[in-house]
Amino acid sequence: MSEPTGVIHDIGYQRYIGPRLGRRHVFGALYLHGLRTVFGLGRTAKAKIFPWLVVGIVTLVAAGITAVRSQIGEVVMTYAQFADSMSWLVIFFVAVAAPELVSRDLRSGVLPLYFSRPLPRDDYPLAKLLALVSAIWLLLGGPQLVMFLGAAFITDKGMRGVWDELLDLLPGLLYAGLWAAVFASIGLLVASLTGKRAFAAGGIVAVFLMTTPIVGTLSILPSRTINELAFLASPSTLVGGVGTWALGDLLVPEGRGGGVPIGGFGPVYGVAAVLLVAACVALLLLRYRKVAAR
């Protein structure tokens, strides 16, 4: 029996001898890449047009509100009201950003490459979700900071006035976080169902806009209870209901009217918002566990 005659050739490859980063670094890299993707950073100029157009619009609106306030000396729009008024724009922002985060990977078939590394199955969707939440929060919170800085410069109450403005800003930022959590969880779940970005974008817009007529129909029924609970039927009005309940005068200044007429069902809206986000996140994780098992 002849001996083996095979030869191993050294063609110059060198083993990696550096530090092997763990799960936290992998998650951080996915999160940072997702955040950059949302705003088109590191991508073509075409990918930057829409996200930065939206950023420009909301910043311009905030600057305009600040300028008007400096002239008339009165609050034109509270920080929480600003988040409400920009929600329609956030819908389209999510419809473009969410498919970029997940639909492209589904269509190109690169998920097996992600999961071939020591990456827990839940980390991929959670990193993408956190990136989208952060992007929406920055989109709504950044202009609020512009409004705050303008108000701080024009106040005639010194540091006391600046402190009062800060106390108004913080609930506004928390409210922006609620918008971000609800919109991102729904948008990413819908986008994860298809690898085609156009279908994903259309589905996201449909979920937010087609639920609005349901609210309108329920709100004109002859039952006051149904009228006050009608706003649970749409994500946008659900968040508005939570804001009306939790923020009160910070969202609807006394004497100006407005807000969502939820009656005494504020806690119901709060619980519904938490359950909605939790359900969307659970379904998103389940979706990627199925994808990883293929």
Task: Map each language-model feature to its residues.
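Alpha-helical transmembrane segments of multipass membrane proteins
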Residues: I57-V61, A135, L139, P143, ...
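Helix-loop-helix units of permease transmembrane domains in multi-pass membrane transporters
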Residues: L101-S134
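Secretory targeting signals
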Residues: L126-A127, A131-L188, S192
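Terminal transmembrane helical anchor/hairpin motif
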Residues: A198-A292
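Hydrophobic alpha-helical transmembrane segments of multi-pass membrane proteins
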Residues: F82, M86-L89, A98, V133, ...
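Aromatic- and glycine-rich beta-strand/loop motifs that create alpha-glucan
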Residues: S2-I49, L286
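Hydrophobic alpha-helical transmembrane segments of multi-pass membrane transport/permease proteins
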Residues: A45-A67, W88-V94, I204-T211, L275-A279
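Membrane-embedded or membrane-proximal helical elements that form or frame transporter/channel pores
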Residues: A63-A98, V102-R104, L250-A272
